[in-house]
Amino acid sequence: MFKKGICSISDLRTLRGVAPNGHISCNLLRLAELENKDSIQAFEMIIRDLELSSGVCRTTYRGRLQDVDALVGPYLLGSFARQQGLEVHDWAASDGLVSSEWARGLFRMFPSCQFTASDLTLYLVEVCRGNGESYIFEPSGVPLQYVYPPFVVSFNRRDSPIFFANRLVRMRAEHGAKSLQRIVSQYRWSDFDDPTEYCVPPDRIRILPLVHPEAHSLHRETKHFRIVPHSVLSPLLEPVHVIRSMNIYHRRYFGDADIAKGAEAVFNSLLLGGMWILGRTVEERKPARNEVSILRKTQSGFQMMCRLNGGSELEESLRSWGLIDSEECLAHCRAIPED
């Protein structure tokens, strides 16, 4: 027995619901630039299920942080002048879709706002071989996927033993990926939409953008919206007014030492009086729920401003590290009740 993968848009129509998302070819990411319904659907299905070798999931989807955006808006209007050149950064923004949704609203509130969406990985690397095979790698050279229609093999997950043919294909793919890793890690691209293609006969090496077409469209439409690479463990070169970091400072991805390092990076990246929007989306609940804390930077740490659905689970840790002011229960701090 073998499990067929989704290798084309026609496969998406016929096999959807049969092949799990991990068996959707990352090659289809390239078709998103066509900006038609089927290609964007394929892009969103891949992104929603994409897990990198670090364990970080790219999971995101349209409207995911809509209630967070609605909550934050009035606080920003009450803290900053409408004509101020507000600098907003959205860290670990995945494909940038929810960033673009938030940015469009902020541009109406703050016409001079500069918005930067960032993520550590903005593209994957595709190696197309002359025999119809494709290997998908992270920019560092770590293999993610092997595609040889009708097979789509994920290197992060193993198929059930009953799919014997898939397991044989995986063994072959692991050998091929190992021989290509060093070559892939040698090449660099200037941006996520860099069209440069390297030829190492019989192979062609190019990138697959991980940026959603709607975010890319906004990036082309206005200089006020940027998409850049950035690590959530590193401070910015220049401090800004607002940083949002949703669904990244999580113990599934980082130990306490790195989470503390990330919190310090946020603190050092904010202007005095700047805001940090911290939280996660609890997908286990149906419907999903955002648990968020809004904090303001002071001279000595962060001051609590508002909580949504009980606030971030990291509040206690931040307090133990001395990053939340002891006088946090101020009159303007309020909690949005849980459902």
Q: What residue spans do the PLM features occupy?
A:
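S-adenosyl-L-methionine
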Residues: 2-81
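Class I S-adenosyl-L-methionine-dependent methyltransferase module
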Residues: 8-40, 104-222, 320-327, 332-339
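Conserved class I S-adenosyl-L-methionine
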Residues: 83-98, 116
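Conserved SAM-dependent methyltransferase scaffold
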Residues: 99-103
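A short acidic, Gly/Pro-enriched loop at the edge of an enzyme's catalytic core
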Residues: 233-244
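A short beta-strand submotif of the Rossmann-like class I SAM-dependent methyltransferase core
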Residues: 244-250
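A short glycine-rich, Lys/Arg-flanked "PGG" loop and its adjoining helix->strand segment in the class I
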Residues: 258-272
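Conserved beta-strand signature within the Rossmann-like core of class I S-adenosyl-L-methionine
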Residues: 272-281
